[in-house]
Amino acid sequence: MAIKTLYTAVGRFERRTNGCNRSCPILLLGGQEYMADMQEMVIWSMLNWRILRWDDIAQEYEKLSTASGYCTERSWEDCTNRLLTRGLLVSGSGETEYDALYDLLGSLSIIPTSGPFFLRLASFVKLTLLAHVPVSAARKLFQKEKRTKYEALVMRLAGQALLSTAEIIKCIDKNISRLPNECALLDSLYGDETTTSDNIASMVKISQSSKPVTLAVANLYLRQQIIFERV
């Protein structure tokens, strides 16, 4: 059976003003700033809030390059591998799509976004003015999405502390919905003799909550309600 591999971006994009008073795009991850050239930024942006296979990255990059007429200096493979080496892209592998998804998300820390209001506003304008989509249809962008039980639990826990997907799974397994302080959190997650930050993802993978939580995290990410960090 062929091993399946999935990829996504971690961190967040910001613009900073340099010493020449010029705006420069940077990527923030784990409290550090990373510079990226145009090709790398295109690939990172392609994978931000998306989960793709290797071949999908190639197809998406080809579409963007053709549409923009941008002349590339390096291959997309070189750019992608450099981003993986720098930790700005991450991958997960497994025998099944779900195994690859869990391997990808299990150790990533989750940060809720404040809600992509301006992104939705820009999309609304684009749909109504440029694509001539009826206002009644475009208005659906602003309708509050209903979250599933597990999506709501993920957001509640992620809003209280910086937790990985695996740590959230263990919290839900232990019926923990409130995190009073860091000491109580660490005791709940790592108070036994076997669990460590290195093995928690493998230890909770077979738990009852593992699959619904992992799928909830993936869906929240694809709906741009969370971003991923690496600590």
Label each PLM-derived region with a short phrase.
Residues 5, 19-21, 214:
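Generic signature of intrinsically disordered, low-complexity, basic-rich segments
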Residues 34-231:
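Long, charge-rich, low-complexity alpha-helical segments
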Residues 10-42, 47-48:
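N-terminal ordered "arm"
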Residues 1-13:
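Hydrophobic, helix-prone linear segments
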